[in-house]
């Protein structure tokens, strides 16, 4: 049975859901259903261990990533359908993109695109974040060279560092053939 809809409204940056739990007509906090007067928190919870573990806040979560033949907007990435066209040897551009949530202050993202021979085609390092970012879209790419994109596997590497430490890394690729991509 459908309970409601999840979506964007107002100035929100990502779909989210507000949940109210009621007990005997009163709203209760499911994370601290019976707080002690004057206490900042309680270990009591309405969640079983499995649910509590699933609800833990996760930092730096990869939502999706891919390759395109053009720079995509956040809206386009959010609405991509399975089987969207991938770059071919004659695509106007080759663009790698990554959508993340939960980035933290001090995070620096770097996205690097490598050609089939391993050379760096494009690289972008974003400045360190001054505050947490609910959602981000990173893109890197190049326009097609005159003879077209050489056939082979193109690799993108996305990395986040914070305080000099790598805190997240992901590599993905697409194979570009003379007539069509092969994932």
Role assignments for model-derived ranges:
Residues 12-97, 104-105, 114:
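Acidic, glycine-rich catalytic/binding loops that coordinate metals and/or anionic ligands
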Residues 107-109:
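Short beta-strand/loop motifs in extracellular/secreted proteins, especially
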Residues 121-132:
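Solvent-exposed serine/threonine-rich low-complexity stretches and specific carbohydrate-binding patches
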Residues 165-183:
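Short beta-strand elements
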Residues 130-144:
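Aromatic sugar-binding surface patches on proteins
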Residues 1-12:
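Short hydrophobic beta/alpha edge segments that flank linear recognition/processing sites
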Residues 150-161:
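A short tyrosine-centered beta-strand micro-motif
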């Amino acid at each position: 049975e459908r309970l409601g809809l999840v979506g964007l409204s107002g100035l929100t940056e990502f779909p989210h859901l507000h949940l109210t739990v009621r007990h005997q007509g009163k709203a209760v906090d499911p994370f601290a259903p019976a707080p002690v007067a004057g206490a900042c928190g309680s270990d009591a919870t309405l969640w079983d261990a499995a649910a509590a573990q699933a609800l833990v806040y996760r930092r730096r979560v990869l939502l999706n990533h891919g390759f395109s033949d053009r720079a995509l907007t956040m809206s386009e990435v959010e609405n991509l359908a399975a089987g969207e066209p991938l770059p071919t040897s004659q695509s106007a551009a080759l663009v790698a993109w990554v959508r993340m949530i939960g980035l933290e202050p001090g995070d620096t993202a770097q996205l690097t695109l490598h050609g089939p021979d391993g050379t760096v085609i494009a690289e972008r390092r974003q400045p360190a974040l001054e505050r947490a970012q609910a959602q981000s879209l990173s893109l890197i790419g190049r326009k097609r060279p005159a003879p077209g994109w050489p056939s082979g596997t193109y690799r993108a590497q996305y990395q986040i560092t914070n305080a000099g430490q790598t805190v997240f890394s992901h590599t993905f690729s697409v194979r570009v053939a003379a007539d069509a991509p092969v994932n």
